[in-house]
Amino acid sequence: MKINQPAVAGTLESGDVMIRIAPLDTQDIDLQINSSVEKQFGDAIRTTILDVLARYNVRGVQLNVDDKGALDCILHARLEALLARASGIPALPWEDCQ
């Protein structure tokens, strides 16, 4: 999936996460995480984000994650909404998701 434009998903409310994405000129993934629960769950947050990006074959992006204690399912949903917005498609290609 190609990221064409910057996008934002989520809020800064307690129990939620705000994620910003922007395309990069390289194939790197620049991931910055700021979380109120980073000491306990930072590795799990990073793993979830990288798993979702790999599932949709996303490369060459900068991600800024401001987590306020979001559950894994919320993080997953926010990421999928963000990818749809940033790629300019109305819905994710569920049938292509492996």
From Swiss-Prot:
Record localization: Cytoplasm
One Pfam family hit: ACP
Residues bearing the modification O-(phosphoribosyl dephospho-coenzyme A)serine: S14
Main location: cytoplasm
Positions of transmembrane segments: none
Cellular component per GO, a single term: cytoplasm
Keyword set, alphabetical order: Cytoplasm, Phosphoprotein
Function: Covalent carrier of the coenzyme of citrate lyase.
Similarity comment: Belongs to the CitD family.
Quaternary data: Oligomer with a subunit composition of (alpha,beta,gamma)6.
Descriptive protein name: Citrate lyase acyl carrier protein
Organism for this UniProt entry: Shigella flexneri
Gene name tied to this protein: citD
